[in-house]
Structures are given as C-alpha cells and as structure tokens.
Amino acid sequence: MGRFRRYRTAWSRHHRSGGFGIHSPFAFNFVQNVLGERYPYYAYARIAKWRATAKAALGGCWPHSSLISLNEARMLFRITNFFNPSQLLVIGARSGVSAASVKAVSSQSVLHLYSPHYAQSRVQQQLLMPFGDQVRHYTDISECVQAYFSQISGDAEPFVLVNEIGDEMELDALKSAILPIVRKQGVIVLRNLHKHELAARLWAECKHHAQYGQTYTNGKTGILIANPKLQLEHFSLWLK
C-alpha cells in the first residue's frame, strides 16, 4: 500500500480498527484486545529500554525511520503473547529490538534468528545475548529455517516474524518455508511492507495462497493467521 493510498484510506482503517463492521468473534477480539490494546503489559518498560539502547547505539548511523517504533515493538509483543509460541522464527534482526520484544513473552521460548550480520552488530549482541542459548543465531537462511521446523512439534503452530528480506535468494527460501504454513496453520508477521519490495511481494504471495484464515494490515505491517476454522477475510486497519 503506497503512501497516498494509506492517507486516502486512513479514516476507513481507523473506523474498522474500532471493531465497526467486523462480524467474526475471533477477529473482533484480536483487533480490540490484541492489536488495539491500550493497557500496559509487564514487558513494556523493558521494550522501551531496549529501543532507547538501540537508538543511542546507532546514533546517526541509521535514519530515524529505520528503527522500529515503540508502538510497533509493543504490538509485536502483544501478538506473540496472544499466541504464546514455544518456538519462534525471526528473519532479519535490524537493531534487535523486534527480536527481543517477541522473545520477552516467555522465558521458556526458543528464538531461531537469521541475522547474517549479527557478529558485526554490537547493538544486536547487547540486546540479545542476555537471553543466552534461548536465542540461536544463523547466518544461513536455509539452515535457520530447517533448524526451526525440526523443533516444531506435531501440534504446534509455526510463528514467523520477517523484518527484512535481503535478496531474491532469501525471498525464495522464505516462500518455500512460509507458503506451506499459509495453506495449513500458523502465524506470519511481515514488517516494512511499504519500504521493501521483496517484503511486499511475499505478503502478496501469502494473501494469494491463503484459502482460509485472516489477514490484518495497515500497509506497513501485515499479520496473517492461517487457521482452517476461520473464514478467509482481509482487514485493513489503523494499527498502533
């Protein structure tokens, strides 16, 4: 969704985000009590501290818009908290704030992180090293994906967060991993749809292959919940 279209649809997205016109009980609850939740969670103070640390460490190295907003980091935490996965797959660490935010949900969860520049990123290390071996680092995306799915038990739903996609090779690897989830069951969160063409293309592929479940997006972040119990619906929202 381009900037002009986001502005043009702002009122309708804001209206829908209040629950108006949403008939699915699951979707209404998810929009109102997860995406739109305004009461603070226990991890919010830690998330704010991580973001402040990343901002200070990065200094003028990155444009301000490249650092995840505090609201989005909190939303990622709430989404993860709602589904409470025991195994998480995160593609791209950026500053490390998003990865730390989803890992903060459970001290028992294991996060499989594909971040080819982790060894050179002091801020990623600063934020993620305190989690110890509960964050497993990979510099090869295929190895990361394979290791993640080998740890998923038969009845567990995959949970995937994609922060960025570096090139066509990574896109192909993610298609092979993610599209089967879309056709079965699991949760996929894609960020930076408005900034990165490859992320937008993967999001379009996910929506195209979805036969059931629900998608939620504001044109910047997309959330796909693949669940055969849910009728296929697409919601354009004003996400916090």
Language model region names:
Residues 1-159, 165-184, 193-240:
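A short alpha-helical cap/connector motif
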